[in-house]
Amino acid sequence: MKLDFVLNIDCLIGMQDIPAETIDMILCDLPYGITKNKWDLMIDPTKLWQQYERIIKPNGAILLFGQDKFTAKMMLSNEKLHRYNIIWDKVLKTGFLNAKRMPLREHEDIMVFYKSQPIYNPQMTKGLPSHSKGKAIGASIEEISSNRIYGSYKVVENKSDMKYPTSIWKFPKPHPSTAISSTEKPIELCRYAIRTYTNVGGVVLDNCCGSGSSLIAAKLENRHYIGMDNGFCDNKKSKYYGMSWADVATLRLDGVADWK
């Protein structure tokens, strides 16, 4: 299978050429269908899932960005595969024109879908040592406990200062003064997601890749990539204005050193 390329094509057509069960991760910022922009048209979820479910590996992860009603629609479009959501804290706030009518917006959703347990590499962070669990006098540290969900389990004290990640990922959104696209996602966020749900050498697909941030992230993390997009850069302040997103992504990828 050909790898490490970007196509200027409708993704519903382009994905038909990807062999079944060959993709380790789909990381995509689909159009939400919430603005009046010509490119912001929601892709038919039924047709999208037909391709996604065909090409993703049985233990592959599908991560889709979303917000508000679009998140709800996508979750309900495949309740069987939807597992949980991650909150992306964008740090930069938006929605100032409506600040007196509703809270400023500071987050987006990242929906996680999969068929069976995917690769999961928790990105540990250093923090304060874990405190001891309160115990009755004379009780063993390794006493047997139980709950309604997991049944019986053994309590083992852990004083490590390494912390597991939570469901909130904090990465600054690209500032409007430097962003190529209004919906551009930070490369570091994409790198974090790719490290979490794939191993080195895995294949990452972004079927609405825009300026290619997710593909750059894959290349930086020593993963293969496939990108698709049939739109063009409409940011008049960008040096890429008028270019197809496929060409923009390819140019940006050319500036990233090969890892092979």
Predicted regions and their residues:
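Core catalytic lobe of class I
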Residues: 2-228, 232-241, 246
